[in-house]
């Protein structure tokens, strides 16, 4: 066989194929370019309502902003259920999303233990990971491909300890759920409160699966501190904590209850009832805020999900996360390069987020306004009413542990 002729025949065939392809492309629209985004949240179990808040915010953002994507570009969300705090399952789901489903961006990150497991994978695989609500400071240290759009417990608890000390309260007790964010919150509040001249007279870490809180809270009552710093992961646990404080008589005593916004979770306030009245929290969002950006957000939310549905700070973290992802996609015209994506995300900003102006710093952490809120009756229902602002707070833990 004449080798030269075979090559020539191949070239001729390829020329015919190319010509045919060009003819077809002239009459058939170019196939849309799909960006696959893996979304790992809790869709089942006792904490599914928290995951639903994030998922609803993601859906709402996509519905309102899909038309802003470059022509021919679409986003496909591939959802996976981590069932709750389950780092092994979260890691496996992330591996499947990257290797089998070929996602180009990971997001979700509802729980710190799960987000830590997922983040560790992204370094080797070079997959951008936008964690939305994991509050442990260490999450963004696991990989240069991680940013967060929610908060950290150091961010919400260190300034709260400073504020508490300035109120003249001398003695504090800390009560936290026993996992990484609780440890962070305890450490942050303790540091700032004692730096301000206060003393920690007792502390307790409560296992996440505990349902009987009274033995723990009896110790708090016996210590009779001026103030109790409380952290739990929100949702139904927030109501269980508050009801236990009420049952043992702390909510009716002179002991003040304070904490990050998880402990008066907006969706749970109707279940807490009057036991939550007067509780002060520090957080990045309240649906009752009168900022125009928030009024617009709540209106869009309730148009989509009904007037009885209330967006929480979990929802806003999901909204911020999808906004950052969409902006990264638009900036690259739908061509996702991992390193270029991370360069865009570090420094990304939104001056009109529902919670106020935000940006992501070079450590991958969100910088945002924090609001002191008090549970009050508002138009016949309980609400977290903002009464003071601490502007543009980053993650203090990163500052204190800078190498």
Positions of predicted regions on the chain:
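Extracytosolic ligand-binding ectodomains
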Residues: 2-6, 15, 32-403
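Intrinsic, low-complexity polybasic segments
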Residues: 9-10
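Bacterial N-terminal signal peptides
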Residues: 13-26
